[in-house]
Amino acid sequence: MKAISPVRSMSSCYQAVCCLSEQSLSIARGSSHKGPGMDEPMGLLYDMNGCYSKLKELVPGIPQGSKLSQVEILQHVIDYIFDLQIVLGEDQQQSSILSLQKSDFSELATQGDTSVCH
C-alpha cells in the first residue's frame, strides 16, 4: 500500500488532531461528555467508535463507505504509518547524501586545486 494522501487543508487536519486529542484526554480523565446519565462503559464505547470513524476519515487508502472491522481499520493505520516512516527515511537519506556531496565539493574548492575547474 502506497502512502498517497488526498489534498487536505492544514486547518482540517489540525482540527481533526485536536478533536482526537480532546477525546483521548476525556477518556484518560474518565469524564464522559456524552451526558451525565450515561454509563461509563457505554460512554467509552461511543468514544472509541468515534475514534475509529475519525481514523477511517483521516487515513488514505481506507475505502469510504465500506464496512470494515476495527482490526482492519487498525491494520490500515499501521500500514500507513509504516509507509510514512519509509518515505521519511528515504527523504532523510537523500538529504544526508546531498549534504555529504556538498561538503566534499567545498573541501575540493578550499584546497585551491584549479585542475578541477578545467
Curated annotation (Swiss-Prot):
Q: Where are the transmembrane segments?
A: none
The reply on keyword Transferase is no
What Gene Ontology molecular-function terms does this entry list?
Answer: bHLH transcription factor binding; protein dimerization activity; transcription corepressor activity
- Where's the bHLH domain? 32-84
Q: Which InterPro entries match?
A: bHLH_dom, DNA-bd_prot-inh, HLH_DNA-bd_sf
- Tell me which tissues or organs this protein is expressed in: At gastrula stage, expressed in all three germ layers, but becomes localized to discrete domains of the developing nervous system during neurulation, including the anterior neural plate, cement gland, eye anlagen, otic placode and both cranial and trunk premigratory and early migratory neural crest cells. Also expressed in the most dorsal and ventral portions of the myotome, the developing heart and anterior blood islets, and in the tail fin mesenchyme.
Disulphide bonds in the chain: none
Gene3D superfamilies on file: Helix-loop-helix DNA-binding domain
> Its quaternary structure?
Homodimer. Heterodimer with other HLH proteins. Interacts (via HLH domain) with the bHLH protein hes4/hairy2 (via Orange domain). Interacts with stat3.
Q: What is this protein called?
A: DNA-binding protein inhibitor ID-3-A
Species, as recorded: Xenopus laevis (African clawed frog)
Instruction: Provide the organism lineage as a comma list.
Output: Eukaryota, Metazoa, Chordata, Craniata, Vertebrata
